[in-house]
């Protein structure tokens, strides 16, 4: 009987495979670091204060800050007083992008944060728990001389969190509050060339709308979008990796179906992991270049969630199926305690994402964090997911500890074997430990590169070479997990080579039909493994 490929592979061949995968891993990092630009670009926008002198402020007219049909504008709020311009007559206008530039579908998404410049006035201070209410209209067009088409119109409330560091005295009037930035807008596609934002701050003293919010001098926006060059590199990687993982997945399942036994749990989970990786890799983002698919961000979150849930489940089942004790765990029900937190945590994060990006499909200005109830609800989902994640890692660490402890304990039986047979078993145990350490190394590398990308400036310079650290993080880690899944399906595919055929004169001292594989879950037609029989006998004694 043959075991998995990793059990029949010599150390030399295993090192060759590892070396090839390492080369591809280095290439993945270099593609992002040397070829791709930074993942995102941030652009600052200063709103232009336009004057709407009409009595009825309807949305039939769009106020453009510059160009041939630019609005009647004022430089600052003080200019409005002698011209008898009221607060309700002022429209803060922002044109996206800046002059002489165009947006592109390659930018994939637009995220905007808002910064209010609020001056201190003794007779108009910011009250406690103040809320600014904005009437926001968003329009688009694809030609510089075409008419604007409305895309969204919403009332956007945001709570102010401002502090004034100087004493509140007359001589400090005119100084600005220090206010937190506010989430403003998120769009999941950039299907048009030009966008226009018209922001009003309507004042209604009877209804206490925009009362006690200080004197707002200016509105600033920071727009963040994905770089087109990075998008092309990212799409190219997904296009290359999709057939690679799909082909190895088909090959893996074909070898399993050729066996005389049904697939065991570990093999099914590895196959499911390959499916989830393929689901992430399929480059459906290519269609976003020609179609206005605003749901792509949400769809991407769902795909990643499915993959991470499968990856976490695989680690638990991988450890459990190599526990080497008297318990049989060839059923997913045997892991309900460990897999349960994964399911609950994933569900909580899915609900949170639907409450945020799901609502943004119809209202790009929505944020669950802008209200007390929304914030409490979001924090509840995140805390529950965090608790589930902690429980999962406690279970995982405990199972990894048990596996290594059991392996160390069972090694006491090895000296009684013949030399060749003992060396073979020691090799199997070494390869299992090696794969466990590779898993930990992949997880550690993900965390390390994430931290490095957050604390660095985004790029390093060595002489005339610039390395984009953030891009290298995205492409390198993405390539790493693809290689990880590829290696799992290749190394853990059933081998069609029998040990008896590979070793002359029965050097291993094993009877015909006796298994020498490490996987401990095959208890069907082919019988249990040699290590499983050995360790189970000791456990029963």
Curated annotation (Swiss-Prot):
GO molecular function per UniProt: identical protein binding; Wnt-protein binding
Keyword vocabulary terms for this entry: Cell membrane, Cytoplasmic vesicle, Developmental protein, Disease variant, Endoplasmic reticulum, Endosome, Glycoprotein, Golgi apparatus, Membrane, Transmembrane, Transmembrane helix, Wnt signaling pathway
Subcellular location: Golgi apparatus membrane; Cytoplasmic vesicle membrane; Cell membrane; Endoplasmic reticulum membrane
Disulfide bond residue pairs: none
Topology feature Lumenal, residues: 37-232, 290-303, 353-380, 453-471
Membrane topology: Multi-pass membrane protein
Regions crossing the membrane: 16-36, 233-253, 269-289, 304-324, 332-352, 381-401, 432-452, 472-492
GO BP term, example: cementum mineralization
Effect of residue 478 to C: In ZKS; results in decreased secretion of WNT3A and WNT5A; decreased activation of WNT signaling
Stretch list, region Interaction with Wnt proteins: 101-232
Protein modification: N-glycosylated.
Domain of life: Eukaryota
Cytoplasmic side stretches: 1-15, 254-268, 325-331, 402-431, 493-541
Record has Transferase as a keyword: no
Tagged with keyword Protein biosynthesis: no
Record GO cellular component, one term: plasma membrane
Homology family: Belongs to the wntless family.
Role this protein plays: Regulates Wnt proteins sorting and secretion in a feedback regulatory mechanism. This reciprocal interaction plays a key role in the regulation of expression, subcellular location, binding and organelle-specific association of Wnt proteins. Plays also an important role in establishment of the anterior-posterior body axis formation during development.
Subunit structure, as described in the record: Interacts with WNT3A. Interacts with WNT1, WNT3 and WNT5A.
Disorder named in the UniProt entry: Zaki syndrome: An autosomal recessive disorder characterized by developmental delay, progressive microcephaly, and short stature, as well as dysmorphic features including sparse scalp hair, cupped ears, wide nose and mouth, short philtrum, and high-arched palate. Other variable features have been observed, including ocular, skeletal, cardiac, and renal anomalies.
Protein name listed in UniProt: Protein wntless homolog
Organism whose genome encodes this protein: Homo sapiens
């Amino acid at each position: 009987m043959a075991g998995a490929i990793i059990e029949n592979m010599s150390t030399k061949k295993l090192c060759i495979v590892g070396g090839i995968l390492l080369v591809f891993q280095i290439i993945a990092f270099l593609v992002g670091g040397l070829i791709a630009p930074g993942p995102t670009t941030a652009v600052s926008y200063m709103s232009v204060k336009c004057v709407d002198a009409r009595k009825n402020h309807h949305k039939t007219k769009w106020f453009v800050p510059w160009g041939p049909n630019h609005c009647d504008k004022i430089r600052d709020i003080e200019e409005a007083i002698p011209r008898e311009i009221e607060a309700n007559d002022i429209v803060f206008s922002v044109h996206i992008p800046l002059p002489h530039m165009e947006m592109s579908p390659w930018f994939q998404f637009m995220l905007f944060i808002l910064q209010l410049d609020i001056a201190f006035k003794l007779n108009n201070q910011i009250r406690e728990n103040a809320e600014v209410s904005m009437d926001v209209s968003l329009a688009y067009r694809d030609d510089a001389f075409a008419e604007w088409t409305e895309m969204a119109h919403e009332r956007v409330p945001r709570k102010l969190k401002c502090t004034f560091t100087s004493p509140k005295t007359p001589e400090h009037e005119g100084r600005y509050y220090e206010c937190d930035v506010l989430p403003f807008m998120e769009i999941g596609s950039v299907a048009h060339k030009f966008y226009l934002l018209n922001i009003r701050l309507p004042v209604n003293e009877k209804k206490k709308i925009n009362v006690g919010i200080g004197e707002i001098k200016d509105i600033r926006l920071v727009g963040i979008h994905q770089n087109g060059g990075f998008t092309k590199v990212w799409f190219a990687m997904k296009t290359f990796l999709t057939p690679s993982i799909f082909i190895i997945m088909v090959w893996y399942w074909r070898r399993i179906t050729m066996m005389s036994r049904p697939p065991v749990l570990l093999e099914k989970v590895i196959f499911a992991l390959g499916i989830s990786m393929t689901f992430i890799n399929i480059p459906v983002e290519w269609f976003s270049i020609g179609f206005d698919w605003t749901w792509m961000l949400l769809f991407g979150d769902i795909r990643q969630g499915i993959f991470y849930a499968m990856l976490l489940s695989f680690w638990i089942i991988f450890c459990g199926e190599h526990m080497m004790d008297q318990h049989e765990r060839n059923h997913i029900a045997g892991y309900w305690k460990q897999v349960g937190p994964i399911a609950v945590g994933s569900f909580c994060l899915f609900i949170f994402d639907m409450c945020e990006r799901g609502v943004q499909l119809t209202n790009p200005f929505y944020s669950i964090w802008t209200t007390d109830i929304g914030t409490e609800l979001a924090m509840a989902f995140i805390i529950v997911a965090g608790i589930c994640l902690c429980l999962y890692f406690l279970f995982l660490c405990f199972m990894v500890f048990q596996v290594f402890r059991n392996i160390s304990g069972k090694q006491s039986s090895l000296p009684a074997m013949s030399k060749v047979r003992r060396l073979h078993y020691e090799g199997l145990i070494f390869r299992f430990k090696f794969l466990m350490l590779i898993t930990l190394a992949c997880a550690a590398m993900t965390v390390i590169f994430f931290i490095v990308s957050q604390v660095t400036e985004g790029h390093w310079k060595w002489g005339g070479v610039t390395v984009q650290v953030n891009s290298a993080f995205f492409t390198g880690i993405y390539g790493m997990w693809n290689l990880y899944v590829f290696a799992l399906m290749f190394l853990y595919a059933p081998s069609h080579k029998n040990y008896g055929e590979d070793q002359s004169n029965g050097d291993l001292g094993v009877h015909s039909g006796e298994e020498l594989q490490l996987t401990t879950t095959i208890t069907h037609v082919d019988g249990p493994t040699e290590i499983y029989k050995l360790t189970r006998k000791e456990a029963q004694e």
